[in-house]
């Protein structure tokens, strides 16, 4: 009888734990006796993944916190490498967390261990020279999006498009009426979802612009309601402080978390660029993407970022599908103009395109990723 498959796996944050758990579940269906160990969060551990270290060891945010924890993170990496080189797994899977995982993968691959990196870093957008290290470090990159694979193909780097787990999770036709009932909002009003970002700097920069736009929109559409999901209590307090100063009388429904629900309930979405734009596309909502950075950050981004568009719907479509208002173009007046177009025009062609793009990346990513790992294992 062959030995059970041994799989090393590392996730560094909550999103990685969710992603890794989906993959582990599919691999367990193929290899019931498989043994998993590495750096694991609660969802992975609930499936039986042995945690050599807790995921919190890697879950750090911001440069100050990273620098403070760096000695510990480097110690964890040394001990992890020592363990896997002394007890080689049949395959190692690094889930996201590229700053940690790519270095681990490189050393393990040089030691003769097969390696997979799940979730391509945004190497197609900036710091493109990283592709050479990724190519040396991995036997396979599992990519969420088709244009990512196309980028890897240019460098003859092994990559497989597996689809996006978010596209698997979201139904092709979300139930707006049900979500409005759940949120307790008026089903007969028009609603705009306002998402000013998840980080402190984003919320600080984008909220004043979005609030000014909302004030103008209220004059134009007196029946318009606003839903504002904030990722946590801190961002909620930050947003409320800005609102108290700039728009104290503006009536808004504030939610903690529930970004997806807010977008499903809305008719149109106004958001800061990021993953939220992909989510808005998947829930089939016309959107206006706005983004503003500090002047130096923008100057730097112009030189580093190599893509024609900033939002994922436009990158997926390969054309300007939804309006992007970046830097000097991101004004309250321009936001009002673009949002108003969606309220005043028929959006069915746009929604149809969103549905086509949803189907393009809805491939049962967990299963596809497990299949790719199984092919590399060869058993």
Swiss-Prot record:
Signal sequence range: none
UniProt-listed Enzyme Commission number(s): 2.4.1.182
Pfam short name (any one): LpxB
SUPFAM superfamilies: UDP-Glycosyltransferase/glycogen phosphorylase (SSF53756)
Pathway named in the protein's UniProt entry: Bacterial outer membrane biogenesis; LPS lipid A biosynthesis
Keywords tagged on the record: Glycosyltransferase, Lipid A biosynthesis, Lipid biosynthesis, Lipid metabolism, Transferase
Gene Ontology BP annotations: lipid A biosynthetic process
Catalytic reaction list: a lipid X + a UDP-2-N,3-O-bis[(3R)-3-hydroxyacyl]-alpha-D-glucosamine = a lipid A disaccharide + UDP + H(+)
Family, as annotated: Belongs to the LpxB family.
Role noted for this protein: Condensation of UDP-2,3-diacylglucosamine and 2,3-diacylglucosamine-1-phosphate to form lipid A disaccharide, a precursor of lipid A, a phosphorylated glycolipid that anchors the lipopolysaccharide to the outer membrane of the cell.
Protein name as catalogued: Lipid-A-disaccharide synthase
Protein's organism: Aeromonas hydrophila subsp. hydrophila (strain ATCC 7966 / DSM 30187 / BCRC 13018 / CCUG 14551 / JCM 1027 / KCTC 2358 / NCIMB 9240 / NCTC 8049)
Organism phylogeny: Bacteria, Pseudomonadati, Pseudomonadota, Gammaproteobacteria, Aeromonadales
Gene: lpxB
């Amino acid at each position: 009888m062959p030995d059970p498959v041994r799989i090393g796996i590392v996730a560094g944050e909550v999103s990685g734990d969710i992603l890794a758990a989906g993959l582990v579940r599919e691999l367990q269906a193929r290899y019931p006796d498989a043994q998993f160990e590495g750096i694991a969060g609660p969802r992975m551990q609930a499936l039986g993944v042995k945690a050599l270290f807790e995921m919190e060891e890697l879950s750090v945010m911001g440069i100050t916190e990273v620098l403070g924890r760096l000695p510990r993170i480097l110690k964890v990496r040394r001990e992890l490498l020592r363990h896997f080189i002394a007890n080689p797994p049949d395959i190692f899977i690094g889930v996201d967390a590229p700053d940690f995982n790519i270095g681990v993968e490189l050393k393990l691959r040089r030691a003769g261990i097969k390696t997979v990196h799940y979730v391509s870093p945004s190497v197609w957008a900036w710091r493109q020279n990283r592709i050479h290290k990724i190519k040396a470090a991995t036997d396979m990159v599992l990519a969420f999006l088709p244009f990512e694979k196309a980028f890897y193909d240019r460098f003859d780097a092994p990559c497989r498009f597996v689809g996006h787990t978010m596209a698997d999770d979201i139904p092709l036709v979300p139930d707006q009426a049900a979500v409005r009932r759940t949120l307790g909002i008026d089903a007969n009003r028009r609603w705009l979802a306002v998402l000013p970002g998840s980080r402190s700097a984003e919320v600080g920069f984008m909220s004043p612009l979005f609030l000014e736009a909302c004030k103008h929109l209220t004059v134009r559409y007196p029946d318009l309601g606003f839903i504002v999901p904030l990722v946590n209590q801190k961002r909620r307090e930050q947003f409320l402080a800005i609102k108290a100063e700039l728009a104290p009388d503006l009536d808004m429904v504030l939610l903690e978390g529930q970004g997806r629900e807010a977008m499903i309930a809305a008719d149109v979405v106004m958001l800061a660029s990021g993953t939220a734009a992909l989510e808005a596309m998947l829930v089939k909502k016309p959107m206006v993407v706005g983004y503003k950075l500090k002047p130096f950050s923008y100057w730097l981004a112009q030189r580093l970022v190599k893509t024609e568009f900033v939002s994922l719907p436009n990158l997926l479509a390969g054309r300007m599908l939804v309006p992007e208002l970046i830097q000097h173009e991101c004004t309250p007046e321009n936001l009002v103009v673009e949002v108003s177009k969606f309220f005043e025009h028929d959006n069915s062609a746009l929604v149809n395109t969103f549905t086509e793009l949803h189907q393009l990346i809805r491939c049962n990513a967990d299963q596809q990723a497990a299949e790719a790992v199984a092919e590399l294992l060869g058993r």
